[in-house]
């Protein structure tokens, strides 16, 4: 089941048995009593008599705009500081934010909620949390709200989720439902200063990342200020669920809303990034009318496309309430929205790109490109003279005063410039496609618009330019996102090693030993052997498995399944075998270890040369060569590849120890940061960390050399852009690298001997040969043209009204040029000239197009003059 299905299933159960699932004792003690909303049917808790919950759709919109409901107007970061100060009395520890790119958790691409920082291992109880009660200002990315940004006033694609997390185990209870709701109410009333009777608590169900539980949302004056989840359950791969061993308070609140609520301004964006909004207002020369904006803002909360079925009807209701024409209302709101979109989208992009994501047409990068192109499309639509790079700089100055790491923006502007060129090229192509569609009078349905955007990158704004009457759905971007949200269903696999003890891996403790004795645990098949211990390294982490011999029988493959290592033999093992002597192919292992360590070195070198946006996107190490896929926004130049080679070899020659450290996951993350997850998510409590001190640190299960010098020379072979945002590097080390260099040198020597010139003279000699070849080609072309002229002249000089001849040695362009010189002589005749797989025909007597169609597949032209291509096979 997906998250929505879980919520739908559990809501009736939680509502029916609310005393079991919700913190009823504390809510009652604080003077709140339960009611059921007469409009939406949800349970809620209030200190005052009311018939409706406090959702904007049920309570009549936002009722805090222009009001002062807190003890003071809080600035953005000030609200966070107040929160931390309040919660310190209960022993909560504030943490630094995690990166937005969720490399430690394979189920997610971007962090979408604060709890993702602790999934899956802390939440599952597999590892210890940094502290039992923590707070964090986690920047999150959510792309399902794109349509709401700038409309509802509260939605963002990138926002700070204020976290309150406690981790309760059977051995250690910290705080859970009853304590947690009391702490939040204390912060709201004492920290922010909201009167208790202005706060309404809603019952709900939360699900995300495979976990779920009851939750309490807290509202005031129509605005949700946060959501405290009591995470008790996890979904199992077969679609069921079970109790979590570690029960978690997962409170998430948009920090942007706290500052907004306290300031009472029409939209939250002016409270979140006031300096950036002021910059945008000045550059665009447009500001919303304050009276209109404040009036609209009170209704904005009911226009959430995620919550209402009929968005059009909701807009009509707002227009009616404001006594405005719907078209006029939308024109005014959309122009304001565009300014907020520029601010929101650029901040999201700034943080995501800083954290290692790149705009592309695949994965999470697809969403980033969406944001970027939407910004440019809106700038084009409103013809604003504003440069996105300047908005980025404003965020770096404003938001970077808090998230100081953003001031180190790396290759950001290079990435944006490359994307701008791609956008312009896409825009040119899009205009041609739209023209053809308009000319053909194609019906542009909502599904067709989404398809055009998703497959061709044609924005709705661009379509609107060419076809003003087209109707763009209000939830357009939500529909686009829905295409990319589908997840594969997990299945429980029955494996061949079920019930077998885990194999003792000796290759980590004894990586330089290659011979061993072991006991046979089981022969799974005559050629699949399981031992109690082994020196054979199994396929994993992109490194090929070892080969060698067991009792003289060749081991051709080794792999691991649930901790059990399986040796695949070339021929059957006698079934009564109980003990074996194994011998690993030493030479093969050494080159694999060298290639693996060289991969870490090349990764460092690529990061050094290209920028900190470079992350590993894949790797493979074989005895022949190694490859490393890196994130990068464009193809590499030969000079960049050479510089990577130089930096890599410089590190190799420094003779830096390659140190293996076994560390707890939490300890490794705190000491080395999330950079350790170069190869993606790594399972387990204890991580094996490969340290090249001062240069590269990665969580890695591979076999390595013990010193960088032992990788030998690293020879870069090639770079290739294998997909949008990913470049593949191939290279060799040790003897393989030497052989590669010698191979290249032998080619140079062969050319040198053949041409009778020295190595240094090969380039200019090749250039001379090339120039001579081009000159000969030019002369050959002239001779061809002359020959064609003679052939046509001779054919036309013969009597008769039909000419059908083969013209040899000419291409189509040469033939057509010659035809132009003789057209006057075609009058009153049928003339056909046939070349190599093409033909030209003219006739005043017959339908020459039909005549050519008898012998050719593709014919274009009229009955008097036609061209033909691709000759039909002769019968």
From Swiss-Prot:
Known cofactor(s): Zn(2+)
Keyword Cell wall biogenesis/degradation in record: no
Cellular component terms per the entry's GO annotation: cytoplasm
Compartments, as annotated in UniProt: Cytoplasm
Record text about domains: Consists of three domains; the N-terminal catalytic domain, the editing domain and the C-terminal C-Ala domain. The editing domain removes incorrectly charged amino acids, while the C-Ala domain, along with tRNA(Ala), serves as a bridge to cooperatively bring together the editing and aminoacylation centers thus stimulating deacylation of misacylated tRNAs.
HAMAP family linked to this entry: Ala_tRNA_synth_A (MF_00036_A)
Name of the molecule in the record: Alanine--tRNA ligase
UniProt organism field: Methanocella arvoryzae (strain DSM 22066 / NBRC 105507 / MRE50)
